[in-house]
Amino acid sequence: MSDAVGLTAAQTARILPNGSALAPASAPAAVQAAIAAGNAIDSYPYPTPDEHYGSLAQLWPAYDCSGATSFVLYGAGLLSANAETSTGLETFGDPGPGRWITLYANSAHVWIVVAGIAFDTAEYGGAPVPAGSGPRWRADPLANLGDGQQYVVRHPAGL
């Protein structure tokens, strides 16, 4: 995982044509680290049903929604090296949306919004860039609400 992330003067993150994201220069270090973590896995595939992985301290060959969200939180220093399930992330942090980071979780799916852009494995937020089935940055942070499911909204304390 890279410790560096490109920065933008904008107040929200910006997605580049190659699919990686730029963090706002004004964002806290944890937010910039979260975007760097997402960039590190933004072209990884979605795993097959029988693939399961361990510690977040090493890169996995594939990421599902909870693995990707856990990796971003871990990269930001907000989660231990143990990946959480989407159900486990329903109780992460504090209730409600955050200023910089917000999670949307239920028993079947989870995604994370960092500095105004979503990091997700579902395609409600537009076509994935780069193409593929795994985690990608999405410009519309709330597009997944279009799936008709109910989500618990959480955020890390202070963010």
Task: Give, region by region, the residue ranges found by the protein language model.
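Intrinsically disordered, low-complexity
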Residues: M1-T48, V129-L159
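Short linear capping/connector segments at secondary-structure termini
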Residues: L16-S20, P49-L56, G88-L89
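Short, flexible coil/linker segments at or flanking structured domains
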Residues: G19-L22, A34, E51, F92, ...
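Solvent-exposed, acidic/flexible segments
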Residues: P24-V31, Q58-S66
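Generic structural marker for isolated residues within well-ordered, non-membrane alpha-helices
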Residues: I35, T69-S70
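Active-site nucleophile-His-acid catalytic modules used for acyl/amide transfer and hydrolysis
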Residues: N39-Y63, N82
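...with weaker cross-activation on analogous glycine-rich loops/strands in unrelated enzymes
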Residues: Y63, S70-L159
